[in-house]
Structure formats: C-alpha cells, structure tokens
Amino acid sequence: MIWKKKYTLEQMNLLSQNTAISHLAIQFSAQGENWLEATMPVDQRTIQPMGFLHGGLSVALAETIGSMAGFCCITENQFVLGLEINANHLRPVKQGIVTARATPIHLGTRTQVWQIEIKDQQDQLCCLSRLTLSVGNHE
C-alpha cells in the first residue's frame, strides 16, 4: 500500500470545504491500495458556453485528485506542490457525473508523477491527464 496518511474519504472531503473543490462539488468517493477516485457533476457550475464539460475544469478535477493522492503518500513533515499538468480531452461530456481516478507512475523522494483518467457514466475515457508534484519538507 502506498498511503502514508490514513485519511478517510470523509476527512478528505472535510479538508476541501469552502474551497474551489467544494464550489465545483468535487467529492472524494473511493480509494484502493494504489488509487484514489473523486467525482464531479457536469452541470451549470462545470460546463462551458456550448454546454459541454469545460476542459479547464477537467484539469482542475485531475489536479485535485492527484494532489490529494500525493498528499496522502507523504509524511507529516512534507508537502506537495504541483509542478506540471497536462491533459488530453478525448470525448465531450454534456451531462451527468464524471469520475477521476489517480494512480501513481512514480513516487520519489522529491517528485511524484500521477496518471489521472476521467470517465463518464458510461465508463468511457473522456480525459487523460498527467500531474507532476514536487515533494518538499517543512522546516
């Protein structure tokens, strides 16, 4: 198991209250031995003018889930910060809920790399993202 911090999904959601994460209604929803999932609705908060899920908000979901996963893989005297994120938007989504799953590609002492897959309710891949995090130490 990769998790060094034993946060429950409820605790992760409480940490996110009164932030951009809660404004977008992102909810941490499931966790496995080496993955973390979150959901986000496709509604008036998350669509662009043409009525599809806004690509920037897919990236916000990817960075949210990847950063929380990274945070749970470090010790109490460490922190993570995003260095780079990219995303390939593969399929438009018009309504419903999307689910993001973050899995680690690399968990090093100074950097982490996470792959995030965002799927629609038909389990079709809509966005594929990669997030690189810097791992720092509190002094």
From Swiss-Prot:
InterPro entries linked: HotDog_dom_sf, PAAI_dom, Thioestr_dom
Origin superkingdom: Bacteria
Pfam families to which the protein is assigned, alphabetical: 4HBT
Record's keyword annotation contains Ligase: no
Signal peptide range in chain numbering: none
Enzyme class, UniProt record, top EC level: hydrolase
Keywords from the UniProt entry: Hydrolase
A GO molecular function held by the record: 1,4-dihydroxy-2-naphthoyl-CoA thioesterase activity
GO cellular component: cytosol
CDD domains: PaaI_thioesterase (cd03443)
Enzyme Commission number: 3.1.2.-
NCBIfam families cross-referenced by the UniProt entry: unchar_dom_1
Protein family according to the UniProt entry: Belongs to the thioesterase PaaI family.
Protein name: Putative esterase PM0788
Source species taxonomy: Bacteria, Pseudomonadati, Pseudomonadota, Gammaproteobacteria, Pasteurellales
